[in-house]
Amino acid sequence: MSQHPEAIAAHGGQLVNRVATPAQREEFVSKAEFLPRVQLDERAVSDLEMIAIGGFSPLTGFMNQEDYDRVVSEMRLANGLVWSIPITLSVSEEVASSLQEGGLVRLDNPAGDYIGVLQLTQKYRYDKTREAINVYRTDDAKHPGVQVLYNQGAVNLAGDIWLLERSSHPLFPDYQIDPVASRQMFRDKGWKTIVGFQTRNPIHRAHEYIQKCALETVDGLFLHPLVGATKEDDIAADVRMRCYEILLEHYYPEDRVILAINPAAMRYAGPREAIFHALVRKNYGCTHFIVGRDHAGVGDYYGTYDAQYIFDEFEPGELGIVPMKFEHAFYCTRTKQMATTKTSPSRPEERVHLSGTKVREMLRRGELPPPEFSRPEVAAELARAMRVQVLA
C-alpha cells in the first residue's frame, strides 16, 4: 500500500533540524570572539550543512568514537541503525590539543566566515588505514576518497552542531530544496512514490533510459545532482545544471520531475556510498532509489554491480527505501534504441556502451558526443562549456 511522503519517516524516525534559532544565533554570535575556532574545508562545510538541514538524519553532529568505530566495521551506528559512511570532523594534533572537551568551538568556512558551532564532547584518534580498507575497499592513496582521508587531520572532533543560518546557494538558489521542502513538494503534487537519482555527471542517454524506466512505476522522479566537492576532472556543477535544465525542458514530462541540488560532497566509496546516497534520499522523502552500474565508483576499484549487491546485506525494513537496480544500459545499433541485455537481442558488437567518463574524454578531444551518447542540445552545451574552459 502506497504512503504519502509525510508518512515516510526520516532515517531514525525524525527529521533532524540543527539550524540555529534566532535566539541561539544571537547567543552564539555574542560569544564569537571568545570561542576557539576551527576552519573547515569544503567537504566539512557541506557535511555541516547536510547535518543541519536533516539530510544526514539521524546525525545531529559529527560522530563520536563509538559511532565511528561501528560504522567503519559494521556499517551501523552504535544503536544498530544502518549507516555506511563515517561523518567526522578531523583536525591536526596541534589544533586538537588547544580545544577543551565540553566547550563550544567556532566553525569557520574556508574564507574565515563564522558559519557554525560545535559542542565538543570528545576528541579521539583513529586508524586511517583501517577506515580506508573498510570504507573504500582499498588503501591506495591514488583513490580520491582515500587521498582526502590520508591528508586530513589525525584527530576527530565529536559533538552536536548548529548551523548559524541557512543561506541561499550562491549559484543555484532556485534549486536549493531542503528535506522539509522536498517532502512538502511531494505532498503538494500528490506523489505517493518517488524515486531518487544521484548523479555527478551530465545525464547521458543511459541515465535517461533508466530514469524513465523507473518513472513508469512510480509517481515522480527526484533528480538530485551533487554540487558539493568532487574530483578535479569532474564536469563543473554549473555546466551540469544547465545540461539538466535543457534535458528536462525538452525530454521529460514537466509535472513528473523535480530538480534539486544535493550540497553533499562525493566520497567515491562505491558500494558503501550507494547505501549512504539511498539513506540521504530517504531523508528527502523518496520511497525508491536508482542504483545503476558502478554507483559512486571511480576507476576500477569496484565491481560493476558491487553497489547493487551490498543492498542484499540488509533486511529491507532496515533501510526504509527500495533500491531499483538497473543493468548497464547501452544504445543498440540493431533496434536503434536504448536497451539492456534483458530487452535487446543484439550481439556485443551492436552495443554502444555509454558513460560519463567517455563523454568527458570525447569533449577533451574536441569531439561532440553523438546522439547515441547525449541528446544534441546537451552535447552542444557541453561542447560550448569546454570551449570556454579552454579559452579561460
From Swiss-Prot:
It catalyses: sulfate + ATP + H(+) = adenosine 5'-phosphosulfate + diphosphate. Its EC number is 2.7.7.4. It is an enzyme of class 2 (transferase). Disulfide bonds: none annotated. One of its GO terms (biological process) is hydrogen sulfide biosynthetic process. SUPFAM superfamilies: Nucleotidylyl transferase, PUA domain-like. Pathway: Sulfur metabolism; hydrogen sulfide biosynthesis; sulfite from sulfate: step 1/3. The lineage of its organism: Bacteria, Bacillati, Cyanobacteriota, Cyanophyceae, Nostocales. Keywords: ATP-binding, Nucleotide-binding, Nucleotidyltransferase, Transferase. Belongs to the sulfate adenylyltransferase family. CDD domains: ATPS (cd00517). It comes from the Bacteria. GO terms for molecular function: ATP binding; sulfate adenylyltransferase (ATP) activity. This is Sulfate adenylyltransferase. Signal peptide: none annotated. It holds the Pfam family ATP-sulfurylase.
